[in-house]
Regions:
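Hydrophobic pocket-lining residues within nucleotide cofactor-binding pockets
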Residues: 16, 109, 134
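Short beta-strand/turn micro-motifs at beta-sheet edges
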Residues: 39-41, 114-117
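PAS/GAF/H-NOX family sensory domains and closely associated sensor/linker modules
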Residues: 42-82
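Short coil/turn segments at secondary-structure boundaries
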Residues: 26, 68-70, 142-143
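Sensory coupling linkers of modular signal transduction proteins
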Residues: 116-156
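Membrane-proximal linker segments that couple transmembrane helices to downstream signaling/catalytic modules
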Residues: 1-3, 151-160
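PAS-family sensory domain signal
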Residues: 1-57
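Per-ARNT-Sim (PAS) sensory domains and their PAS-associated C-terminal
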Residues: 65-113, 121-125
Length: 160
């Protein structure tokens, strides 16, 4: 768990039972990444509304993965079926047109909390969501793939 937190660029918490994106946790030294990966949005807010707004930035090729985690009902169903974590990866188009790869990891748990509205303890499903910018890893993978393809093409040309 500590390793996941250290690798994360952004962490935020969501009450999946009530559809509330509660807060963003900014890690020391990751303030810039946090601003890049997390939209400027007033908190607390509806998690689903936040995701739908963010979805406008997601590329068509990767939107299916993003949509697996874009609302509380889907995540609660996964949790009720025994899943406690899941990861998806998607591409977000930045304002300057560049593409950023993002890995989103959702860690879910059930907690009993005191509800001040009804003045009683109630079970809630919470998620800690971790975002990691994986653009550099994808660029390295693409460069390695191109290098291997060039070596393969050269080897094929020599064998003719």
């Amino acid at each position: 768990m500590d390793a996941l937190l250290e690798l994360s660029d952004v962490i935020y918490t969501v009450n999946l039972t009530k559809d509330v994106l509660e807060r963003r946790i900014v890690l020391n030294g990751k303030e810039q990444k946090s601003r890049e990966l997390f939209m400027d949005y007033p908190l607390p807010c509806s998690y689903q509304d936040y995701c739908w707004e963010y979805e406008k930035k997601i590329t068509q090729e990767t939107i299916a993965g993003y949509c697996m985690t874009d609302n509380c009902e889907k995540l609660r169903k996964r949790f009720e079926n025994g899943e406690t974590n899941m990861s998806v990866e998607y591409c977000a188009r930045e304002d300057d047109g560049s593409i950023r790869w993002v890995q989103k990891t959702v860690l879910m748990t059930r907690m009993v909390v005191f509800d001040t509205e009804i003045l009683a303890e109630v079970p809630m499903i919470y998620a800690i969501i971790l975002l990691q910018d994986t653009t550099q890893r994808h660029e390295r993978d693409e460069q390695e793939q191109a290098r291997l393809q060039a070596a393969f093409n050269e080897m094929r040309a020599e064998s003719r």
